[in-house]
Amino acid sequence: MNQTLLSSFGTPFERVENALAALREGRGVMVLDDEDRENEGDMIFPAETMTIEQMALTIRHGSGIVCLCITEDRRKQLDLPMMVENNTSAYGTGFTVTIEAAEGVTTGVSAADRITTVRAAIADGAKPSDLNRPGHVFPLRAQAGGVLTRGGHTEATIDLMTLAGFKPAGVLCELTNDDGTMARAPECIEFANKHNMALVTIEDLVAYRQAHERKAS
């Protein structure tokens, strides 16, 4: 990732710390992956605190595929089958079947309905019967080990939520341009500045975790 583009957001470690602070303050974070991977920026929010307004922003400026990143333990708790048995997608993204809250929603499409679905899925005592399948929220199962195992937005979201002190569950959606094309780093940086979002790269998060885990050992 071009560090000159990112310099206004601080050093790699500062970017991670700023992202964690933003999440704790209820703000969103823009997460960029490598230019030779997906080369995309995802808007992420804590599943526990994301507001209807933030969901509306995400739907309006994103791909429309609003994803809920969860752990394997949560997937099992909710009895969510993986979307396919043989995942042949380019990066092995861990989609499960889609979901809708069983109660408290209308069509499930609105920002408010999607927030209701997210909250139902991450509730402490959530049961499989609390969710209907299919629906308009796309759960993503993160790999154990986070970004140190797989350098994806799904794992980055879970790692950031955990480091910020939230449940390991977060909402993500890819940022798109007004013409429907995918936003690349310059557009993601502009959007993050405009909407008071912190910005961090998956590479930053890998380095941050490696450094902290070396200290711990």
Swiss-Prot record:
Disulfide bonds: none
EC code(s) of this entry: 4.1.99.12
Residues that coordinate or bind Mg(2+) 1: E38
Pathway: Cofactor biosynthesis; riboflavin biosynthesis; 2-hydroxy-3-oxobutyl phosphate from D-ribulose 5-phosphate: step 1/1
Obligatory cofactor(s): Mg(2+); Mn(2+)
Keyword Manganese: yes
Protein name according to UniProt: 3,4-dihydroxy-2-butanone 4-phosphate synthase
Source organism per UniProt: Escherichia fergusonii (strain ATCC 35469 / DSM 13698 / CCUG 18766 / IAM 14443 / JCM 21226 / LMG 7866 / NBRC 102419 / NCTC 12128 / CDC 0568-73)
